[in-house]
Every structure is written in structure tokens, then in C-alpha cells.
């Protein structure tokens, strides 16, 4: 690990991974709530056209990609909000138009080569220099500040757009703001995970967080944690395993999702087993049943198979004897109804 940290390009790569690991899930949490999980892919393919323009003109590809992605974000929201075309169709047009334009433009570049786009398509975080890092840091700061300041209103729109509109919120403006933040996040992340995989870092940490968090705030924290750990861990693993950083980061994020899904499912099954309804008994409890009788308030419990059983009109409530001993009467688990309701129906 000390060897890794002694390398300038790896330190820069780790810093960029942290920035992307925070920014992408923060924007993604609102996209998941609004069921726009694939909008990052559309933005990424439009950004590809911007990268191609930068390569062709000799300008910084990051800046031209940013202009293209932001313009596409605004266009999609305008078409969706005012035009007759639905949002998914508008996104599809931008999706295919962007990638087609990128391929055609890059073919016209004097230095046309697949390597020109590989770093942007699949990520090449270790090739980012200090200037790139400053640009990424500035764009990531825009995303962090924007999501922090707009989070109450973005949450309101994501939760119920029609109610937010009726409440007087500028829904169209907030939609455009979210689309622009998404475009900026795509550009920030394209050198880390690549334009073809950027949606994964926006969506998968949030999918994992929804399994672990019980509230929107908790889910957001979990998403950022999973995003940062996946990004940093993916960079470290890719260095030692000599694998592409983008694919490694995404596979690690998917691994966290699988572990969380498996663990929460197993925990849910264990809890369901603990609260299994009591089976009916083949015999009736009463003075002649032969089991020890224990006075319990205004009725009598009978000890059977390590539990107390209280006869209540055709069913039996099972009580944990350890809890009875601890608190004097306990609350037990019932086949139907609460213990208080069972007491009301007990034979007197």
C-alpha cells in the first residue's frame, strides 16, 4: 500500500475516485427516486460527441464534453416538459444521436484512432494529470453544493412531482437543475469509470443503499459510503490486478449489492422464522390435561414444551417462560390478537 501511495499518478487517481464516489451517488439518489436510472447513459453518449469535438478541434475534451452534456440535459427537459415527445423518446434520440455524432466526428480527426476514445469510453483514471484533477474537483464541488442546496426541493419533486407543482415549487427549473447536475456528474466521472459505465456508479450504490437504509437520509449516506468504497477499492484492486479501473469499480459495486441483497434476505427469513405463528395443539389444555398450571392474572397458563399456553376461545397463546420469570408476567407472542385482547376473552 505504501508503494501505491508513493506514486503521484495513483494519489491523483485515488483523489479523483473519492470525488466521483461522492458526487455520482448523490445525484443518483434523486434519479432513482424519479425512475430515471438510465439517463446517465444518454448523457454519457452525448458527452462522447463532445469528446470527439474536443479531439477534432484540439480543445480540452472535458470542456467540450461538459458543454455537449449540459446542452443535451436542458434540451431533454424542455422537450419532455413542453413538447409532444415523452421523456424516454427524447432521451433515446439524444442517446443514439450522441454516439453516432461521436463516431462520425472522431473519424474525421487527423489523429483518428480507437485509442483516442478508449480512455473516455471505459475509463483510464491513472492517465489523469494534475490539471484534470483540478477540473474534476471543481466540477465535483458544483455537484456537491448544488445537491446540498437543492436537496429539499429535489426530494419533493422526486417524491411527487404533481404535488410539488401544486405547492408552487418551480418544478421545471428543478428538473433542469437535476439534469444539469447529472450532466456535470457524467463529465466528472468519465475518466474514472468511463462514459459507458457511468450510470452504474450513480445507480448501483443507491440500489444497495435502499436495502440498508430505513429513510431517505440514511439511504443517501449508505449510497455515498458504498460509492466511495467501490471507487477507491476498485482503483486499488485495478492497480494490483492490472485490470481496467472502470470495470473493476463497477464490479466491486455490484459485489456490494449482491452481498447486501443476500444478507437482508437472509435476515428477513430469520426474523420471519422467529415470529412464526404457533401451531394448534392436538389436545385441550385444562384442569385435566396433566400439565403444570401457573396462575397468570385472571386466568391460568399451562406449561407445555417449555412454553406457557393460555387457553383463549379455541386457540392458545404461547409465552416465553424466561420473560415471564424476568418481568412477572411477560407479553409473549400470540396466535391471534394482542395479549390484552386475549385476556379479555379468557375463560373466567
Map each language-model feature to its residues.
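Transmembrane helix-bundle core of multi-pass membrane transporters
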Residues: 3, 8, 12, 91-150, ...
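Loop-to-transmembrane alpha-helix initiation sites
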Residues: 13-16, 61-69, 88-92, 137, ...
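Short loop segments and helix-boundary regions at transmembrane helix junctions
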Residues: 29-112, 209-221, 238-241
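Small-residue-rich segments of transmembrane alpha-helices in multi-pass membrane proteins
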Residues: 46-56, 94-105, 127, 171-181, ...
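Helix-loop-helix "hairpin" substructures at the membrane interface of multi-pass membrane proteins
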Residues: 129-205
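Transmembrane alpha-helical segments in multi-pass inner-membrane proteins
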Residues: 192, 196-243, 247
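Cytosolic-side transmembrane-helix boundaries in multi-pass membrane proteins
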Residues: 243-250, 254-278
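Peripheral (non-transmembrane) domains and long loops of multi-pass membrane proteins
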Residues: 271-348
